[in-house]
Amino acid sequence: MATTSAAVLNGLSSSFLTGGNKSQALLAAPLAARVGGAATPKRFTVLAAAAKKSWIPAVRGGGNLVDPEWLDGSLPGDYGFDPLGLGKDPAFLKWYREAELIHGRWAMAAVLGIFVGQAWSGIPWFEAGADPGAIAPFSFGTLLGTQLILMGWVESKRWVDFFDPDSQSVEWATPWSKTAENFANFTGEQGYPGGKFFDPLALAGTLNNGVYVPDTEKLERLKVAEIKHARLAMLAMLIFYFEAGQGKTPLGALGL
C-alpha cells in the first residue's frame, strides 16, 4: 500500500498533470496523510492548467529570457518575449503595452495607405510629399501646423486619459460632442473604449435598441488578432524603410 501511494504521489508531482506547485500540494496532502493506512475511496478531479505559450516554440526553461516571471500570459498576445526586461515594473509594462497598441494601429493604417496610394497614383510613398500638386492649394507649413495642432490635441487627451481613466469622457472635455457618452470606456479596459463611436460596426459588442453592449468573448478574440496584425505591420514598416533607403517601394521590391 505504501509503495502504491508513493507512486501516486510521484505522479502527482508532475506539472503536466496538475499545472503548478499549488495544485500539486493541494492534491498530494490528503494522500500523504493516508500512506500506510486504510484509505476511504473518494472522487477527485485533476485539472490541468493551460500551458503558457512561448515565443520560442517547443522550448521550456531558460529562465526569464524564455519565460519572464513578470509576464503571466494575461495580456493579449503575451508569449513571454521581453529579453531586455522592459516590463519588470508593472507601471512600465502598462505604458509599453499602450505604446505598442497605438504604434501598431498607426502602422496598420500606414501599410494599407502605402499600398493603396502607390497603386492609385503610381507615386512612391517616400516621394509623395515632394509633389507640390498633392497638397495644393495649401502650403506645407499650413498642413504641418494644422496637423500639429489637431494631433497635439488628440494625443494630449489620450495622455491625460491614460493617467486618469475616463477623465476625458465628460462634457467639458468634448465640447463639440452632443453627449460625453460617446467617449466613455464601455469595456473598462485601457486602449479599448468600444461604444458606438469607436466601434460603429459593433465588432466587439452588440447594439440593442441603440445601446452598445460589449461582448467579452468577441473582444478578447479581436484583441489577440489586432495585436498580432499590429506587430506584423510594424515589422513591415521597418522593412519598407530599408527598401526606401535603396530607392525601392514595397510593390517594386515584389516586382510589381
UniProtKB/Swiss-Prot annotation:
GO molecular function, one term: chlorophyll binding
Record-given protein name: Chlorophyll a-b binding protein CP24 10A, chloroplastic
Transmembrane stretches, start-end: 106-126, 134-154
GO cellular component: chloroplast thylakoid membrane; photosystem II
Similarity field: Belongs to the ELIP/psbS family.
Biological source species: Solanum lycopersicum
Keywords for the protein's UniProt record, in alphabetical order: Chlorophyll, Chloroplast, Chromophore, Membrane, Photosynthesis, Photosystem II, Plastid, Thylakoid, Transit peptide, Transmembrane, Transmembrane helix
Membrane topology qualifier: Multi-pass membrane protein
InterPro entries: Chloro_AB-bd_pln, Chloroa_b-bind
Location within or outside the cell: Plastid, Chloroplast thylakoid membrane
Protein's GO biological process: photosynthesis, light harvesting in photosystem I; response to light stimulus
Record has 4Fe-4S as a keyword: no
Source superkingdom: Eukaryota
Gene (name only): CAP10A
Principal location listed in the UniProt entry: plastid
